[in-house]
């Protein structure tokens, strides 16, 4: 009996993450977010919780590849990596918000 090798496609999440952070403007503009970049940090109102009026309520660190909501701690619910940020924004728009949904959304953009 002959053994057949199965070709599997794998997705390197670190590579996807790197692509996102190399051109994060694409993602932020897709969500219609207003933001300000100061050095290696991006600041904006939190797009996840309602009533966010603090223009520096969320920071995204381009060197740490992580985000944080300083107003209500939304990162505690969703996680701090960029895929979690996407999940949170999708959730706030009443869209599906599983990891696979976030990954699919990002892959369509890049």
Description of each model-found segment:
Residues 1-110:
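N-terminal structured subdomain of primase-like DNA metabolism proteins
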